[in-house]
Regions:
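Long, low-complexity C-terminal extensions of enzymes
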Residues: 128, 132-234
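Central beta-strand plus flanking loop segment that forms part of the substrate or channel wall
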Residues: 1-22
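Conserved FAD/dinucleotide-binding core of flavoprotein oxidoreductases
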Residues: 31-86, 106-117
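Extended charged low-complexity segments that act as oligomerization/scaffolding linkers
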Residues: 21, 73, 129-130
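Conserved mid-domain beta->alpha element of the FAD-binding
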Residues: 89-152
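Acidic/polar loop patches that form or flank catalytic/metal-binding clefts of enzymes
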Residues: 21, 78-81, 133-138
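Tryptophan-centric aromatic hotspots in well-structured domains and transmembrane helices
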Residues: 35, 94, 98, 107, ...
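Conserved, well-structured functional cores that handle cations and Mg-NTP chemistry
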Residues: 5-7, 25-35
Length: 234
């Protein structure tokens, strides 16, 4: 496996003591130790006990300290501690007949919830392999590796501007660099020089076409700029 660059390697899951269904979207909340996701979930759902997650780096923050901070900032009951690595398989196809997907293929922290769409994209690539003349095994390997690197880059980009916290975690997160490829630069320029309509994918009524960086259109890059309150050229 190759390591994917990311500042997060652990998460504390919690059961919320408030009604998360009052919100219509998931939240990503910056914390001194990393960030926390809050997913609107009905109490009767099996995932309700795990719908709040305190993501942090265990090499920077001890588990006990992270749990204390989690409970101090969010009204939850701690239900589980997990540690993980961020990785992608060197060989997504084994012996020309075994196709890796799911956690056998890769794992990347939960920001942007990229897993499910990635699984679908990889499954489509494997299906295309069985359609004569569409793709070969080398293309699948190259495309899969490139796709996961683009997912890594887009997520890592979120950390580059830091947060309101001046802490060891955020110093570390901002220090992580990634190889900015030509496509990334093109999306950055495209999103900063065009308005929402021009960057929105055409299937949603815009003029942005169907091309994606990883699984994100130029519109997502533009939203990043606006979320960071960065003045654009439009």
């Amino acid at each position: 496996y190759y390591d994917l660059i990311n500042p997060i390697n652990a998460c504390i899951l919690g059961k919320p003591k408030w009604d998360t269904t009052k919100a219509y979207w998931s939240r990503h909340v910056a914390t001194p130790d990393g960030w926390t996701f809050v997913i609107p979930t009905y109490p009767e759902s099996p995932s309700h006990d795990y719908c709040v997650g305190y993501c942090y780096n265990s090499n920077i923050t001890k588990k006990e300290v992270a749990e204390f901070n989690f409970l101090n900032q969010f009204d939850v009951e701690v239900t589980k501690h997990i540690k993980f690595k961020n990785y992608v398989a060197k060989e997504p196809v084994i012996d020309g007949r075994i196709f890796l997907n799911g956690n056998r293929l890769f794992f990347l922290e939960p920001m942007e919830s990229s897993s499910t769409q990635s699984y679908l994209e990889v499954a489509k690539a494997f299906f295309d392999y069985y359609l004569p003349g569409k793709v070969n095994l080398n293309q699948i390997k190259t495309n899969t590796t490139q796709y996961m690197k683009e997912c890594q880059n887009f997520i890592l980009w979120h950390y580059q501007a830091g947060s309101k916290y001046n802490t060891p975690f955020w110093d570390y997160a901002k220090s992580l660099t990634f190889e900015i490829d030509e496509r990334f630069n093109r999306y950055v320029i495209w999103s900063s020089e065009n308005d929402n309509y021009d960057t929105l994918p055409d299937q949603y009524g815009g003029l942005g076409g169907k091309e994606l960086y990883g699984q994100w259109p130029a519109y997502s890059f533009r939203n990043w700029y606006e979320g960071m309150n960065i003045k654009l050229n439009t």
